[in-house]
Amino acid sequence: MAPLPGAELVRRPLQLYRYLLRCCQQLPTKGIQQHYKHAVRQSFRVHSDEDNPERIQQIIKRAIEDADWIMNKYKKQN
């Protein structure tokens, strides 16, 4: 299960960035939202110079899996 509809449509880094920020808006408190938004921004900056298409797809896949895990974690707590 993907955290938000549209995960299967993410193909490019900018799409991933927007998708992950939308996921952050679904988290329960402002503090948690800000924490994960900061983490998304930092990751985007760290990987901004990546130019290998295979590696980019690997990063996108992993980021969506991580977002799924985080969303499920907070769903179970509520």
Curated annotation (Swiss-Prot):
Superkingdom, natural source: Eukaryota
One CC-aspect GO term: mitochondrion
Pfam families assigned: Complex1_LYR (PF05347)
Family: Belongs to the complex I LYR family. LYRM9 subfamily.
Family matches, as PANTHER family: LYR MOTIF-CONTAINING PROTEIN 9
Name used for this protein in its record: LYR motif-containing protein 9
Organism: Homo sapiens (Human)
